[in-house]
């Protein structure tokens, strides 16, 4: 049975209560209060819903993650990085990145990054929890991604690209930065061909929960200069 959250109840059900179909649906309702969002990621779930739906909270099994030491950079991508076609920055324009991620795409109907979602994550950014990666070409924003840093874990949310390899360059730059700071895992949530090409793989929900428990409160071991 699906758990419905009230606006005053920040407690999520155990992850093993998530539905098998649709895979990982854990709870519905509540709101996008910053404290609730932080509680959700600490618990192992995330919001994903369309306009007109209640807020839906998910914890899929398996979970797609990337371990920084397993990052795969193809020859063509390595060449692109060496050529320095792009400038990559952190937290220069979070709002522009999340708006670009929310923009309609040719292969999808609508967007799950609703206006309330954008405002909620912008608030997390102001609190130093959510971060953006910007990829620039000739002073134009051509790619980027955003997510949350918590302990030695990074929770990726969405990325976009307006130029070939732009989002991949941003992602690789972020992963290398996180690796140097001692991060152990990047949550990619759901599988995509794009992420698998970069080294992401699936682990069980239980294994993901173990990483959460162990690393969500550990400070980075290196300089996390966002």
UniProtKB/Swiss-Prot annotation:
InterPro entries listed in its UniProt record: Acyl_CoA_acyltransferase, Leu/Phe-tRNA_Trfase, Leu/Phe-tRNA_Trfase_C, Leu/Phe-tRNA_Trfase_N
Identify which top EC class this enzyme belongs to.
Answer: transferase
GO MF terms, alphabetically ordered: leucyl-tRNA--protein transferase activity
Known catalysed reaction(s)? Answer: N-terminal L-lysyl-[protein] + L-leucyl-tRNA(Leu) = N-terminal L-leucyl-L-lysyl-[protein] + tRNA(Leu) + H(+); N-terminal L-arginyl-[protein] + L-leucyl-tRNA(Leu) = N-terminal L-leucyl-L-arginyl-[protein] + tRNA(Leu) + H(+); L-phenylalanyl-tRNA(Phe) + an N-terminal L-alpha-aminoacyl-[protein] = an N-terminal L-phenylalanyl-L-alpha-aminoacyl-[protein] + tRNA(Phe)
Protein's GO biological process: protein catabolic process
- Cellular location of this protein? Cytoplasm
Q: Which GO terms describe its cellular component?
A: cytoplasm
Pfam families registered for this protein in UniProt: Leu_Phe_trans (PF03588)
Keywords from the named record: Acyltransferase, Cytoplasm, Transferase
Top-level taxon in the UniProt lineage: Bacteria
So what family is this one in? Answer: Belongs to the L/F-transferase family.
Tell me which HAMAP family the record gives.
Leu_Phe_trans (MF_00688)
Main function:
Functions in the N-end rule pathway of protein degradation where it conjugates Leu, Phe and, less efficiently, Met from aminoacyl-tRNAs to the N-termini of proteins containing an N-terminal arginine or lysine.
| Protein name listed in UniProt | Leucyl/phenylalanyl-tRNA--protein transferase
Organism of provenance = Pseudomonas aeruginosa (strain ATCC 15692 / DSM 22644 / CIP 104116 / JCM 14847 / LMG 12228 / 1C / PRS 101 / PAO1)
Q: Which lineage is the organism of this entry classified under, starting from the top rank? A: Bacteria, Pseudomonadati, Pseudomonadota, Gammaproteobacteria, Pseudomonadales
């Amino acid at each position: 049975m699906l758990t419905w959250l009230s606006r005053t109840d920040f407690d999520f059900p155990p992850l093993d209560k998530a539905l098998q179909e649709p895979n990982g649906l854990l709870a519905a309702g509540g709101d996008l209060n910053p404290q609730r969002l932080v509680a959700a990621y600490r618990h192992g779930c995330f919001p994903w819903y369309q306009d007109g739906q209640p807020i839906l909270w998910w914890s899929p099994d398996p979970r797609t993650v990337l371990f920084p030491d397993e990052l795969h950079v193809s020859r063509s991508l390595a060449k692109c990085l060496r050529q320095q076609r792009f400038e990559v920055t952190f937290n220069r324009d979070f709002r522009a990145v999340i708006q670009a991620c929310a923009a309609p795409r040719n292969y999808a109907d609508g967007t799950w990054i609703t206006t309330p979602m954008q405002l909620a994550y912008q608030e997390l950014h102001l609190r130093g929890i959510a971060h953006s990666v910007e990829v620039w070409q000739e002073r134009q924003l051509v790619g980027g991604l955003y997510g949350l840093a918590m302990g030695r874990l990074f929770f990726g949310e969405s990325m976009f690209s307006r130029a070939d390899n732009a989002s991949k360059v941003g992602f690789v730059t972020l992963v290398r930065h996180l690796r140097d700071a001692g991060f152990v895992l990047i949550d990619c949530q759901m599988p995509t061909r794009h992420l698998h090409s970069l080294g992401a793989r699936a682990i069980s929900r239980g294994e993901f929960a173990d990483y959460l428990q162990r690393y969500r409160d550990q400070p980075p071991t290196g300089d996390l200069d966002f």
